[in-house]
């Protein structure tokens, strides 16, 4: 079901057609979970991968340079966040990804590919292990095809949940760790978050 954002106002006059909110159109793009937050702060919204996305605030060049020198936060909630669980999970998912999940420990993640029946590449993705389930992030442009492929080829014992109401943020730049450190608690050490490691915060 499409998420509407009737209470927000489209910021960019480039995409504001006759003052109507495009997110109310049933066949149009959907809104991200943080849509209202972006619009209230002047985000310029453009259509991408079936969603209204904040492409910039004050200016692309300034934001690019700031991220290169400091850190920038990007809303990538259009990407597919999936949770998989059930008996025989590793073997079932390994039939679709060319990696060994048995060696993937909790708090670790791997880059992999989603394959078709002939071994052809459908998409690239990230997969993490959390206790008894896997968390997977697939690309936004191919998300629905990926979900359909997974549901078609995974056995009935495997549950696939699409976290479409959860935001996904990417913190990037040389000062990203310093920025993140101000927002974590519970004794989490960022020193332990080396390449391909992850943690709940």
Predicted region positions:
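Basic, glycine/lysine-rich polyanion-binding surfaces/domains
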Residues: 1-201
